[in-house]
Every structure is written in structure tokens, then in C-alpha cells.
Amino acid sequence: MNTNKIAFAIASVGVALWAAMIAVGAAGLPQMTRQDIPGVRNMTQVDPTIACAGATDASAIPEIAKRGYKAIINLRLASESGAEIDAARAAAAGAGVRFIHMPFEVSNPDESIVDRFIAAVSDAANQPVFIHCASANRAAALLMIKRATADGWDNGRAEAEARAIGLSNPSLRDWALAQIAKRKR
């Protein structure tokens, strides 16, 4: 057998093992589905109690309420373009949905948000909960921390879910992993 055939065989086995590991990891995740609500960007129904999304217009909140969400956790800063915090708060009040504003600055994250986020998401009175920021990066990072600390998931599974939701910022991922390590001590 020549060297090229051996290298190809080894590479083929490696690819097959990698694919199997991905499949096993994905099988451990809840069944997530992409949802479409006009005025909501990048929405994922993570499980029966949690949905994560990116930018959400205040005009979408009545439909969010119609779909049964009890609370909206908004992670956007009031200074972000298109954040509409006051309009979202008013729309939530009008739709009978609890509005929880937890401003989360990616460039200088305040770790105190982690415990407040976990408490709010875990509170049965808020479930099902709709969590959003601008792109789903912050929502996914905070949910990753909750999964790995409060829900007992291993870091790999929590990160795989977060990436599927929308976590793509490497520094935010690193911050989330540091928060997990700090809380798992």
C-alpha cells in the first residue's frame, strides 16, 4: 500500500470519528427550532421554556405574548441603535408580559448579570421566557453559563447549544467560559 493510500485511509477514519462526535454532541441537545416572527431577528425556540433571539422590535411583542411567553429579558443597552427599551417596556405592559431589562455591555461585561439572569430564567413565573439582545450572542452566552452551572451540563454541550443559538463572538465565549469556571469551583 502506498503512502498516499495510507494517508487517505487515516484521514477518512479521522473525518468519520469527527462526524460521529458531532452527531453524539448534537444528540445531547434539546430539539431547537428556528422561529419566524415579523420584527424578530434570529429566533430559536431552545426548549419549551426558553427562546433566544436577536434584535426584537417593540411591534413584535404582542405576537410574542400570543405565543405564550410570560417574560421578555432584554439584554440590550439603551444606547444601542434600535434598542427601543421604553417602547418595548410599554408594549410588554400592554400585552401583559413581564419586561426585564438587564443591560449587558459586551466590551465590559459586569459579572453580576450572571446571577440575575440565572434567577430570572429559572423563575417558573417567567416561563416560557423570551431572551434577546441584538444578534443572540449575549443571550446565547448567558444561557451557556446557566446550562453549565445551574443545569449541570458539561461545558462542551452548553457551548454547542450556545453556538447553535448564535454565539459567535470569541471574547464573549471566553468570558462565558471564565464565568463557568469561577462558578464551578
Question: What name fits each language-model region?
Answer:
Residues 2-129, 144-185:
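Cys-dependent protein tyrosine phosphatase-like superfamily
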Residues 129-140:
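A phosphate-binding catalytic loop at a beta-strand-loop-alpha-helix junction
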